[in-house]
Amino acid sequence: MHAYDAAPGDDGLPAVLWHHGTPNVGAPPEPLADMAVQLGLRWVSYDRPGYGGSTRWPGRRAGSAAVLGERVADALGIGRFAVMGHSGGGAHALACAALLRERVTAAVSVSAPAPYAAEGLDWFTGMYASGAAGFRAALRGRAELERHQAAAAYDPEMFTPEDHAALEGDWSWFGEVVAAAQAGGPGGQIDDDLAYVAPWGGDPAEVTAPVLIMHGDQDRVVPSAHGGWLAGRCPSAELRLLPGDGHISAMRAAPAALEWLAGISRRTAGAEPG
């Protein structure tokens, strides 16, 4: 497994374990790097199995992030840490927080999907057509999803005008991590998509740390109803709906999330788990 550490050996800094989206690699978000330094945060992350330098793990679930995250933290000598993720990474971050309650101090989820079996949520309503088709293929199994992905093409309609502006401007970094992820073939994305329609293996209702859910109200990739459901499921969640934002442009609010997370991380640094 390939891991990242923005401040190797600096055990005095509160750590944030970043969970990347689909298809991405785990490089911590470049647009937030300077702010993380200013806030005194230590970014750590890893490539999920099948991406970048990490070998595949067929059958992994969102909850597998707890196993992987714990390995990274242990290897780096990190005891407690916050988690943060965007898109599918938000689902992995919340599942990690649910399963590692003794270690996770806070969680931030931006534009994340809810579990497929989320009670009372119509999972596909508001989702762009080709994205919904891909997840329906995943529900029919790995072979069907592989056939679908082999024939699929990029659909610019998945993103709003605000998303496209972000991708061409302050969040052009996404192009780099997507290219790095796709260079290794489709395996990581296929395993991710199968995980999103399978049980997470960790219930958001079991998260005990403070949670911040952020979601653009114009999101076509993961409709904002998913964020609302997650906020209602996590016992201590705060929901911030972002007017006019889509799936990518929602990350323009990430600096505020980082400040929120840094404040909690400082208060809990060195505290005994419990």
Where are these regions (language model features)?
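Conserved HGGG/HGGXW glycine-rich cap/lid loop of the alpha/beta-hydrolase fold
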Residues: 2-53
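Conserved acidic catalytic loop of the alpha/beta-hydrolase fold
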Residues: 64-81
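Flexible "cap/lid" loop of the alpha/beta hydrolase fold
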Residues: 106-140
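Alpha/beta-hydrolase
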Residues: 127-202
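Short beta-strand/loop motif that positions the catalytic acidic residue
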Residues: 207, 213-215, 219
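Conserved alpha/beta-hydrolase "acid-adjacent" motif
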Residues: 220-226
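Catalytic active-site module of serine/aspartate enzymes centered on a nucleophile-bearing elbow/loop
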Residues: 237-274
